[in-house]
Amino acid sequence: LSRRVVMYHLKELSFREFLQFEDFRLKLPKFQLDDLLKNHKKIARDLKQQLTTPIKYFDAYLKHGAYPYYLENRQSYASKLNQTINLILEVDLNAVENMPYEDSRKVKKLLIAIAQSAPFIPNITRLSERLGMSRVFLINAIKLLNRADLVMELYKPTKGVGALTKPEKLFLNNPNLVHVLGNQNAEIGTLRETFFANQMKHLHDIHLAE
């Protein structure tokens, strides 16, 4: 029998999953988005009976809660996450996309540029001039970073998305990446916006408002 590989897209830990790693005694139910919107006060009161300091846990989640290897050593988490990013850019892109090393270095340069400003509305012409890339290479590189779960692309709902369509707004894929690649002192609004988009995108279609 030939070997068969089942592909599975394993996303980051949710905040609920992170909490259960932090305290195995917690029994936290799942909630549908509609239920949260309609009954958020009651849900918050019920959760408060189990979880007395949610903000403390949430702050920790934003810094190191996305990937479970934080459990091995929290002090070296940022370094290990940086190593994972380098592995994706320098090894995985070459293996999957047959990308030369020099091009992977350009993609890394792009990721750093995004990290310094995310979330932001990209000016493709200005970015391509600044980074020394063609427009086509730049847009393709953004798509690759999105597929690698390093950035998120957002579009307006009325706009068609094609292979060479530039995103309306770019985010880093989760708050941990904001801390590691962008800014250790990132604004809490940026972190919360990134968190919300990350948690919603796997279960819902999210768009920029018109």
Where are these regions (language model features)?
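Interdomain motor-coupling "hinge/lid" segment immediately C-terminal to the ATP-binding subdomain
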Residues: 2-105
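Accessory nucleic acid-recognition modules appended to NTPase machines
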Residues: 71-210
